[in-house]
Regions:
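A single, central transmembrane helix in multi-pass transporters
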Residues: 31, 166-174, 211-270
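Juxtamembrane intracellular "pre-TM" segments in multi-pass secondary transporters
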Residues: 1-12, 192-223
Length: 399
């Protein structure tokens, strides 16, 4: 455990620095994968599946969380995961250097899965460090701070993705490797003693985690809400890729601007999100409804510049939602259960996004981009209205 307040604050800043550099790399990677895959294959469903492959490892996130909780040296775990993530980028060299569709798809998918798996490990470690390095009364502000910095980093990553694609796939991939490798540096300077607590068996860890889920109704409701919301929002990547590249016939710069503006909105939204008080339902229900309405409105816009307006609003709403929701969740989770609980949330609530990109691609292929944006909007609105029936989540106080 960390006892010295100065050390704890320094460690938190280093954790945020690691998050920021990682987000630059992973956000650039996520857009590059969509663009590269669609350009090499010209099949939206495959591009959507490539996007979804990043979340495939989240089906096993509970086991990852259990492993991270059990590991004595979490710093070393984070370093190894970051090294593997950086090296995996070179698999893309093979994909872009061949003209055989099966080889292209295989190496792109393999790279994305490794990126997703190692990022899940890193996220689990950071979730524990956020709990350890902050006091309880700092959770909401700390969460907002991490979200704000993370979103600014995503903006940089989205801008970088456009540049990396513009300078050529091989040069861009090399530049992306440098960014991801740099994320290791802050971890090296984090000071944390190895955890000396007694360890249970993996089977006991699983039973304890599932028991905690069964007894914590707000966690069940949060997961259900995430399944619906994430299923919709995760289609956003393939939706905007096709909108910019195939419908508007614009280059990657316009594509990256979409996600830069989402991140800008999140940064702006996280400011009031860090200060808002009251019942969680009262805070997030109207925000989810507005978010859904903004997604649906994009279906009726025929200019990329007009599209940018609802995009900023979507980001702002997300930025306001996350700090109060995350602070409520963190307060309910014991430190020793943090990685496993995040693993449960990822496995049940986030892994569903594995299917989202493919579903979005199929909707586009068999109907049109118009209907995809309407479906995304409807699902987000339904997730907001569903909170009315989730008493524990709806009435949770945000102090």
């Amino acid at each position: 455990m960390i006892e010295d307040l100065g050390t704890r604050r320094k460690n938190f800043k280093l954790t945020v620095s690691n998050l920021a550099i990682s987000r630059v790399g992973t956000s650039a990677f996520s857009l590059m994968i969509l663009w590269i895959t669609l350009q090499l294959t010209h099949i939206p469903a495959i591009a959507g599946l490539a996007d979804g492959m990043f979340t495939l490892p989240l089906f096993f996130s509970f086991f990852v969380g259990s492993f991270v909780d059990r590991s004595r040296n979490k710093k070393m775990v984070a370093i190894i995961a970051s090294v593997l993530r950086s090296v995996s980028i070179f698999l893309l060299f093979i994909a872009v250097s061949t003209h055989v569709l099966a080889v292209i798809v295989f190496f792109i998918f393999l790279c994305v899965v490794i990126m997703g798996f190692t990022s899940d490990i890193s996220n689990s470690v950071r979730a524990i460090w956020e709990k350890v390095f902050l006091k309880e009364e700092e959770y909401q502000k700390g969460s907002a701070w991490m979200m704000g910095i993370g979103s600014l980093a995503e903006m940089v990553g989205f801008i970088a993705s456009g540049i990396f694609i513009y300078i050529g796939f091989l040069r861009g991939i090399s530049a992306l490797f440098v960014v991801l490798a740099a994320s290791i540096i802050p971890i090296i300077f984090i000071i944390q003693k190895p955890d000396q607590r007694e360890r249970q068996s993996v089977k006991s860890d699983m039973k304890e985690g599932l028991k905690f889920l069964k007894e914590t109704k707000i966690l069940q409701q949060m997961i259900f809400l995430m399944i619906i919301a994430n299923l919709a929002v995760a289609m956003m990547g393939i939706a905007f890729t096709v909108l910019v590249e195939e419908i508007f016939k614009l280059n990657s710069v316009y594509f990256s601007i979409v996600f830069v503006l989402v991140s800008l909105g999140i940064v702006l939204g996280s400011i009031p999100g860090s200060k808002v008080k009251g019942k969680l339902g009262v805070i997030i229900i109207p925000l989810l409804i507005v978010t859904g309405a903004m997604f649906a409105s994009i279906a009726f816009l025929h200019s990329i510049y007009l599209t940018y307006i609802p995009v900023v609003v979507i980001g702002f709403c997300v930025g306001m939602i996350n700090p109060p929701a995350e602070s409520v969740l963190i307060k309910r989770i014991p430190e020793e259960m943090m990685a496993r609980t995040i693993g449960i949330v990822n496995t049940m609530g986030v892994s569903v996004t594995f299917f989202s990109g493919t579903i979005g691609g199929l909707i586009i292929q068999f109907t049109s981009i118009f209907y995809l944006f309407l479906i995304i909007g409807a699902l987000v609105i339904l997730s907001g209205l569903g909170i009315f029936f989730m008493k524990e989540l709806r009435d949770s106080p945000v102090k």
